[in-house]
Every structure is written in structure tokens, then in C-alpha cells.
Regions:
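Adenosine-phosphate binding glycine-rich loop
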Residues: 263, 268-324
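Segments forming oxygen-rich coordination pockets for charged ligands
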Residues: 2-221, 230-238, 252, 273, ...
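ADP-ribose/adenylate-binding Rossmann-like module
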Residues: 202, 239, 244-245, 255-280
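Glycine- and other small-residue-rich loops at beta-strand/loop junctions that grip anionic moieties
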Residues: 77, 81, 242-243, 266, ...
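Beta-loop-alpha module in the N-terminal Rossmann-like domain of NAD(P)-dependent dehydrogenases
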Residues: 247-251
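A short acidic, often aromatic-flanked loop/helix-cap motif at beta-alpha or helix-coil junctions
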Residues: 133, 225-229, 299-305
Length: 324
């Protein structure tokens, strides 16, 4: 959905000079930005949501990206690389003051000729007030790792879970369940965690567990489950990766992973190792349809041997799959 353009009456460089605008208190307080923060959590107490509703040509962000101007002040998130955030703050203050949605156009086709997008594209942004109630439901769904949609009426400004209007889908974050032993397992789990993703390493090896703790991880002990153990507690937004040098430990874990709805299941090793684990899974009675989901060799870089390169290669492959 592409938003229509409703220019704000005060260009950002002249708003402060308008007596009426200057007389209005700034309900958002000191607009100090936190571009790396959590915009959804920032709106727990209500505020203004700034949402990309349309993109023309090249741009860094896609429709559905949003940032927050919390009621208590400041801003969280970013819609550009700093090109429009100061201007959005001015519009957000007005939205908070009069509780009216504003729809803006930046870049190509915009009335704001002094705000240029270096990428050369056009960007439609809607700013609308939002109360704590729908955000509380969204946060609860995220905590439960449930898919959730907020319907945002770009005309009335109504924000209703599952309602009509622009559909803001809030998917659970990609989660990583990592099993294995050795530096490859630790490197991968640490990289995923450092990138901001939930990552849990499970290992039978105490040296691996110690190395993981040194990286700030909290590894779990591998109890070597039987082949008939319950499926892993993985949801459709979970990736399961195995980094074992002792491939005999893989089949029971892989059988449990393939019985779950995890969107990605893969194991480190050569093509020969992959064929051996496929045969082992067949002998365990795992269905061919489930085995077909197993990735191997894993990673975008063929035959990566350096642990750090392997970690980056596998992480990139998984995130590419998650975006599909």
C-alpha cells in the first residue's frame, strides 16, 4: 500500500519560527535518538509510530519498517541513514499533540525539496498515534513467539490487532538452536548471538561449554537423547544447526529436529558425511520427506574450513532462507 502525500504545514527549518508552533509544548520532550533500540518495546507506554508504507526505487528499508517516538520522549529505531529522522521528529510531535495521522513523502516526488534521499528513491511514511493496549498485545505475542499483525488505518489512525488497513506483520525473531562440540559450534553460536538473534548452544563437551561461557553464552548439557525422544521445541522461525566432528552423535538430534517445524535444519560436514547421515536417518525410520529438508553441506561458501568463515557462511545462508 502506497501512502498519499499530506505535507506538514511547517517545513522543518521554519517550524520554530512560527509563533503558534513555538507556543505549543513539545509532548515528546527531548528527541534523543536510539537507532539501534527496540521500537516496539519503546511504544509500551504509547506514543507515535512512524511506518514506511511505500518505497519507490532504491532504499535501505522496506515497507513495514517502523520507528517509535515514545510518549516519554526520544526516538527509537531508524527509517533512513539519518536523512529524515530529525524531520520525522517534528511531525511526530505534532501527531502526538493533535492525535491526527500524517502521511508524508520523502525523496522523489516530495514537496520537501531540502530533504534529499541520497539513494535517489522515494519513501512514503505514515505517522500515527498508538496507545499502550495494542502494543501490549503485540509484545505478548512476541514473548510467546507467535506471528502477529497490527492493522493500521492510514486514514483514521486506528491501530487494531488483526484489523483493516496497512498490515504490519510482526514475526518472531529468527532463533538458533546449535548442537555440537568444538570451536565451530562456539563460533557460530557466538556470532548469531552477537548479531542480536536468540541462540542456544547444546553440547556434551565440557571444554566446549567452557569456551561458550567465555563468549557470554549459557550452554546446555547434551543428554544424548534416544532416537524416539520428542521433537525439538523448535517453531517455524527456528534454525537448527549441528557442528559435530563425531558424526555418530548427529542422527538422534537430527531426527528430533526434522520432526519439528523448524524452517532450517543443517549439519556441518562434507558431502560424504551428509550422505552417511541421510542413510543413518533412513535406518532410524525417518521419512524421506523429512530427510529431504536436511541441509548439507551447509553454508554459502563451499568447503569453508576456517571456523569464523564457516560461521559467517552458515549464518548468511540461514538468514537468506529466513527472508523468503
Amino acid at each position: 500500500m502506497t501512502a498519499n502525500v499530506t505535507p506538514f504545514p511547517f517545513p522543518p527549518d521554519r517550524a520554530a519560527a512560527d509563533p503558534q508552533a513555538a507556543a505549543q509544548p513539545d509532548p515528546l520532550g527531548d528527541l534523543v535518538g536510539d537507532p539501534l533500540g527496540d521500537p516496539l518495546a519503546a511504544l509500551a507506554g504509547g506514543g507515535v509510530i512512524a511506518l514506511i508504507t511505500g518505497v519507490e526505487g532504491p532504499h535501505y528499508r522496506s515497507p513495514g519498517t517502523f520507528m517509535a517516538f515514545p510518549a516519554q520522549g526520544g526516538s527509537v529505531g531508524q527509517l533512513s541513514s539519518g536523512c529524515i529522522e530529525a524531520d520525522l521528529a517534528i511531525h511526530a510531535a505534532q501527531v502526538a499533540h493533535d492525535s491526527r495521522t500524517r502521511r508524508l513523502r520523502y525523496g522523489a516526488g516530495s514537496p520537501f525539496i531540502d530533504l534529499v534521499l541520497p539513494c535517489g528513491g522515494g519513501l512514503d511514511v505514515a505517522l500515527t498515534p498508538v496507545g499502550p493496549a495494542p502494543i501490549a498485545r503485540a509484545l505478548a505475542a512476541r514473548a510467546a513467539r507467535q506471528d502477529f499483525t497490527l492493522g493500521i488505518d492510514l486514514d483514521s489512525g486506528a491501530v487494531v490487532p488483526g484489523g483493516p488497513g496497512f498490515q504490519l506483520r510482526l514475526k518472531p525473531a529468527t532463533r538458533f538452536m546449535v548442537w555440537g562440540a568444538g570451536v565451530e559450534a562456539v563460533r557460530f553460536a557466538a556470532l548469531a548471538s552477537a548479531a542480536g538473534y536468540p541462540a542456544q548452544l547444546t553440547t556434551h563437551d565440557e571444554a566446549t561449554a567452557d569456551a561458550a561461557r567465555a563468549q557470554g553464552l549459557s550452554p546446555l548439557r547434551d543428554a544424548a537423547p534416544a532416537k524416539d525422544a520428542a521433537p525439538l521445541d523448535a517453531d517455524p522461525w527456528t534454525a537448527v544447526t549441528l557442528f559435530y566432528h563425531d558424526h555418530d552423535r548427529e542422527p538422534p538430534v537430527l531426527a528430533r529436529a526434522l520432526a519439528s517445524p523448524a524452517f532450517y535444519v543443517g549439519a556441518q560436514g562434507s558431502l560424504r558425511s551428509h550422505r552417511a547421515r541421510v542413510q543413518a536417518l533412513r535406518e532410524m525410520g525417518v521419512a524421506d520427506a523429512d530427510i529431504a529438508r536436511l541441509r548439507g553441506p551447509i553454508g554459502l561458501i563451499p568447503s569453508a574450513r576456517d571456523p569464523q568463515v564457516l560461521a559467517v557462511s552458515v549464518l548468511a545462508e540461514i538468514l537468506s532462507e529466513a527472508e523468503r
